[in-house]
């Protein structure tokens, strides 16, 4: 039986979403993706219902006084407190810290499965964008069992809450649309997941 993880569109959508959450919109990784989302062609290639995507596509193209790089800086870098921090341990750790117990559990799981994933800097591996990029890499390399575990154990337990807060506080139509696109896409993945999603308490 072919699972959704084995379809090409899973790896593509995971990589697109991961890059847009992880890299600056001006970077060579994401600049072409940003331009693609400002056109209508992408909707036909995204594995979701066209009716659900239509309002998202409109929002991507909505004008904002704040530039996209400024919005990305505010949402993902600082210097002020991030409205919806993109690291799992901030949501899963009682103290809402980086490099919390959930990050250590992810590292242990990666070691046990022989997974090496280079981060840009000395930052936690449980960044929402980097986990999506890792899921894409696992799917592309035929490691579908590990990909399912990554989603069920290390991403889905906190991603819905993160995306809800991210959308509410994005403050920029492009990133609000990106959050909605991610929420719709991940909900579809979770509905098709074979193994159960781990139930973990959230502290934000």
UniProtKB/Swiss-Prot annotation:
Keywords, sorted A to Z: Chaperone
Pfam families attached to this UniProt entry: Nitrate_red_del
InterPro entries from the UniProt entry: DmsD-type, DmsD_chaperone, DMSO/NO3_reduct_chaperone, TorD-like_sf, TorD/DmsD_chaperones
Domain of life: Bacteria
Example of a GO MF term: signal sequence binding
Ranges annotated as spanning the membrane: none
Xref: HAMAP family: DmsD_chaperone
Function: Required for biogenesis/assembly of DMSO reductase, but not for the interaction of the DmsA signal peptide with the Tat system. May be part of a chaperone cascade complex that facilitates a folding-maturation pathway for the substrate protein.
Membership in a protein family: Belongs to the TorD/DmsD family. DmsD subfamily.
Full protein name: Tat proofreading chaperone DmsD
Species per Swiss-Prot/TrEMBL record: Salmonella paratyphi A (strain ATCC 9150 / SARB42)
């Amino acid at each position: 039986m072919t699972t959704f993880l084995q379809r090409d569109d899973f790896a593509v959508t995971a990589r697109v979403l991961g890059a847009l959450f992880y890299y600056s919109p001006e970077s060579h990784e994401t600049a072409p993706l940003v331009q693609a989302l400002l056109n209508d062609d992408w909707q036909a290639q995204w594995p979701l219902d066209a009716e659900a995507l239509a309002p998202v596509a409109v929002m991507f193209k909505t004008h904002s006084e704040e530039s996209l790089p400024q919005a990305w800086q505010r949402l993902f870098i600082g210097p002020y407190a991030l409205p919806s921090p993109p690291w799992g341990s901030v949501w899963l750790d009682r103290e809402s810290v980086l490099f919390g117990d959930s990050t250590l559990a992810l590292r242990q799981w990666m070691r046990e499965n022989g997974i090496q994933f280079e981060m840009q800097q000395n930052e936690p591996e449980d960044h929402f964008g980097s986990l999506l990029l890792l899921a894409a890499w696992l799917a592309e390399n035929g490691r579908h069992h590990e990909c399912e575990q990554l989603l069920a154990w290390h991403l889905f337990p906190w991603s819905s809450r993160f995306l809800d807060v991210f959308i509410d506080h994005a403050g920029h139509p492009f990133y609000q649309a990106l959050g909605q696109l991610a929420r719709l896409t991940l909900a579809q993945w979770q509905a098709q997941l074979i193994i159960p999603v781990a139930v973990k308490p959230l502290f934000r």
